[in-house]
Every structure is written in C-alpha cells, then in structure tokens.
C-alpha cells in the first residue's frame, strides 16, 4: 500500500478508517445530523451523535447503514465523503481504498459502496469480504490449506 492508501470498515454503528503506516486514523459513529427543512447535512460522526435529543424536531439523526450495507445512499455518500476528506489532504494523490463489506452483499449493494467511495475521491476501490479482512487483520495466512474459525461477537 502507498502512504495515502486507506482501508475502511463500514460498520452499522461505527466507521473506522486506517492508513498505511499510521494505523487507525478515524473512528466515528455511522450517523449524520440532517436539517429536514433544508435537506442539508449539518454534522457527521461524534458531532452528529452529540446532537441527538438536544436539537429541534427538524434536525434528525440518520444512521444510513443497516446490517453493514447501505440503506440510505445519499447519507452514506455524505458520511464517507466527510470522513475520507478528514483523513487525506487535497494536495495528496487520490487514495486507493479497500472497504470491508459483508460476505453476503448483493451486486447492487456493492455498486452503491463503490459509488459512494469514488464520490469521496478514491482513485480505486477494492471490496473485501469481512471474514477475509478479519483473517488478514488477525495475522492468518489465508493462502494456507488449514481450517480456521473467526467469530464476530459484535
């Protein structure tokens, strides 16, 4: 991976972004605060979550991911764009991005993830099944012909 390439774990409750040589550079809740009157996003992540229950009725908290897949395409794109732009500066080459997705994701859902990440400024997008990413992240050599079990306790 090049220095500005990033990996994204698009979780239902949390988005984590890691960068080569730096480790985790962003860990934020998967939520946006939207002004429903103006149809504009006010905040994302921690700042949006802090607004829950403390704002007028016309400001809604939207959790755009359900079961690890996109349920609100527009809000997911906004969330990813904001977070990717926080991680890399505009003078850098556009990053290649690896995104963890559920193994059972449909073609339409995977297309939506790729489109959202490209809209955020990615040069190339690679989708990696979550079990494969978990195995690689825990140091398992997935090229070896041996059985391993990975349990997701979340």
PLM feature spans:
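Nucleotide/phosphate-binding catalytic cleft detector across ATP-hydrolyzing
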Residues: 1-153
């Amino acid at each position: 991976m090049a220095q500005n390439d990033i990996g994204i774990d698009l979780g239902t409750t949390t988005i984590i972004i890691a960068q080569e040589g730096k480790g985790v550079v962003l860990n934020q809740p998967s939520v946006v605060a939207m002004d429903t009157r103006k149809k504009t996003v006010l905040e994302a992540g921690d700042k949006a979550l802090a607004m829950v229950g403390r704002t007028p009725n016309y400001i809604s908290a939207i959790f755009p991911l359900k079961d690890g897949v996109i349920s609100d395409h527009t809000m997911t794109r906004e969330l990813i764009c904001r977070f990717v732009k926080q991680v890399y500066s505009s003078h850098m080459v556009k990053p290649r991005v690896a995104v963890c997705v559920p193994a059972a994701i449909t073609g339409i859902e995977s297309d939506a993830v790729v489109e959202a990440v490209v809209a955020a400024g990615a040069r190339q997008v690679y989708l990696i099944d979550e079990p494969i990413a978990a195995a690689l992240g825990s140091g398992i050599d997935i090229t070896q012909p041996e059985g391993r079990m990975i349990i997701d306790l979340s």
